[in-house]
Curated annotation (Swiss-Prot):
InterPro entries registered for this protein in UniProt: Eno_Rdtase_FAD-bd_dom, Enoyl-CoA_Rdtase_cat_dom, FabV-like_NADH_b, Trans-2-enoyl-CoA_reductase
Phylogenetic placement of the source organism: Bacteria, Pseudomonadati, Pseudomonadota, Gammaproteobacteria, Lysobacterales
Official protein name in the record: Enoyl-[acyl-carrier-protein] reductase [NADH]
Description of how the protein assembles with itself and partners: Monomer.
Pathway the protein acts in: Lipid metabolism; fatty acid biosynthesis
Active-site residue list: 236 (proton donor)
Matches recorded under Gene3D superfamilies: NAD(P)-binding Rossmann-like Domain
Biological source species: Xanthomonas axonopodis pv. citri (strain 306)
Length: 402
């Protein structure tokens, strides 16, 4: 079928399979250009492997270090009459090109919060991956979590704590500057956000993997976080989501103590703000990203997801000099270091009050934001003919969990 973008709110409801594949190929090429190292992870499990930072982790492990990878995600496959989600096509493309490079690649499509997913992962590690993994990446960004056992569904809330938060934002449907107000989260919403977005599920995964004996000696685990700056703190770090990320930090400290006994470790990696399906949903982030992209591009500091993950693997987790990674006071790996430079943040703060609907495209990189957003779904690529027919029913080596 012929597919063009249709945007509703912060979601693009259509996806382009070929565009998604080209996006993945672009990330593979960027990784290969930095050379393949053999002194890093060999068997890698990625939870939340189909888009954003999780996908970039999988690409970096496979094409930067020659690792075998197992990816878990929750995506909608395409059919002959309807396109699937971008993550489905991203994962299909990854699988195709990893196999072409002679690498083991297997995927599981299902609820990563479920015990069934853990059981299937353990089975595959034992039967197909030599029995153990040496790196587990935790990269889930889900608004909903069904609790294993009880089946109770919890939802996260992107809300401030204590008082209503009002700030300048972009109405991305109309490309206008608005004042957005968000009511504060209730105590229950805060608790539920911690349950969905905190470290509980990460710990359940490590419990299961360790209990089954499928974590190698020296195995590492990393989970992703974002802290940001005072511009976004009310909605993020000081909001309900921030409480979940603090819980993630506490979890990392517990897991690190456990894995360190066998020569491994666990860290939270704090990454920079990028255009992903997850960040597009957070109020104020599109405007902040549009500003920070412009400033960082001007300073030659801009990075996308693949550049961030490349730096995380090569300069932090698996340093060529064999030294332990540099961490902050909370034992976190900081990849937001360039974004948080004073010269970058001071420029952002100076720019923020000046932005209006009239000068939005001129003062910020909102055009770049819109381009990157549509690109997530396979659109806006110059190497794809969007008026040509494209097959939407794409299958690959993926186990469907019922």
């Amino acid at each position: 079928m012929i597919i063009h973008p249709k945007v509703r709110g912060f979601i693009c409801t259509t996806t382009h399979p070929l565009g998604c594949e080209r996006n993945v190929l672009e990330q593979i090429a960027a990784t290969r250009a930095r050379g393949v190292r053999t002194d890093g992870p060999k068997k890698v499990l990625v939870i939340g492997a189909s888009s954003g930072y999780g996908l970039a982790s999988r690409i970096t492990a496979a094409f930067g270090f020659g690792a075998d990878t197992l990816g878990v995600f929750f995506e909608k496959p395409g059919t002959a009459s309807k396109a699937g989600t971008a993550g489905w096509y991203n994962s299909a493309a990854f699988d195709k090109h990893a196999k072409a490079a002679g690498l083991y690649s297997k995927s599981i499509n299902g609820d990563a919060f479920s015990d069934a997913a853990r059981e299937k992962v353990i089975e595959l590690i034992k039967t197909e991956m030599g029995g153990q993994v040496d790196l587990m990446v935790y990269s889930l960004a889900s608004p909903v979590r069904k609790l294993p056992g009880s089946g109770e569904v919890k939802r996260s809330a992107l809300k401030p704590i204590g008082q209503t938060y009002t700030a300048t934002a972009i109405d991305t449907n109309k490309d206008t500057i608005i004042q957005a107000s968000i009511e504060p989260a209730s105590a229950q919403e805060i608790e539920d956000t911690v349950t969905v977005m905190g470290g509980q599920d990460w710990e359940l995964w490590i419990d299961a993997l360790e209990g089954a004996g499928v974590l190698a000696d020296g195995a590492r685990s990393v989970a992703f976080s974002y802290i940001g700056t005072e511009i976004t703190w009310p909605i993020y770090w000081h909001g309900a989501l921030g409480k979940a990320k603090v819980d993630l930090d506490h979890t990392a400290q517990r897991l690190n103590a456990r894995l360190a006994r066998r020569g491994g470790g666990a860290n939270v990696a704090v990454l920079k703000s990028v255009v992903t399906q997850a960040s597009a949903a957070i109020p104020v982030m599109p405007l902040y990203i549009s500003m920070v992209y412009k400033i960082m591009k001007e300073k030659g500091l801009h990075e996308g997801t693949i550049e961030q993950l490349d730096r995380l693997f090569r300069e932090r987790l698996y340093r060529e000099d064999g030294q332990p990674a540099q961490v902050d006071d909370e034992n976190r790996l900081r990849l937001d270091d360039w974004e948080l430079r004073d010269d970058v943040q001071d420029a952002c703060k100076a720019l923020w009050p000046q932005v209006t609907t009239e000068n939005l495209f001129e003062l910020t990189d909102y055009a770049g934001y819109k381009h990157e957003f549509l690109k997530l779904f396979g659109f806006e690529r110059t190497d794809v003919d969007y008026d040509a027919d494209v097959a939407t029913d794409v299958s690959f080596d993926c186990i469907e969990l019922g």
